[in-house]
Amino acid sequence: MSGKHPLVQAIENSQLKTDLPEFAPGDTVVVQVKVKEGDRERLQAFEGVVIAKKNRGLNSAFTVRKISSGVGVERVFQTHSPVVAKIEVKRRGDVRRAKLYYLRDLSGKAARIREKLPARKA
């Protein structure tokens, strides 16, 4: 049980998104972000590897890292934010850590992640 007031808990539960896919650190995802430019709004895609995930109910967040023109770019997204329009899992990664911060020090082929293969049917 969380130490939150039942009213606060009820309001937070009403704000949670339910259409989110299952994803984990190591997965390659495309995050569609709503960007407001002047009076119009458009979707901007941010594709990269999930290097960290923080599960805290409404305060859940995840960090995505990509290499853009030779420079590493990391962006932290609030999972249930209205700014995040859609999350699409491109590739499942097979990793043994919950936080992949060691990828910050690796570049090129060393930073590759094995793909998780679907479970075999017995």
Curated annotation (Swiss-Prot):
Keywords: Ribonucleoprotein, Ribosomal protein. GO terms for cellular component: cytosolic large ribosomal subunit. Pfam families: Ribosomal_L19. GO terms for molecular function: structural constituent of ribosome. InterPro entries: Ribosomal_bL19 (IPR001857), Ribosomal_bL19_CS (IPR018257), Ribosomal_bL19_sf (IPR038657), Translation_prot_SH3-like_sf (IPR008991). One of its GO terms (biological process) is translation. This protein is located at the 30S-50S ribosomal subunit interface and may play a role in the structure and function of the aminoacyl-tRNA binding site. NCBIfam families: rplS_bact. Belongs to the bacterial ribosomal protein bL19 family. This is Large ribosomal subunit protein bL19.
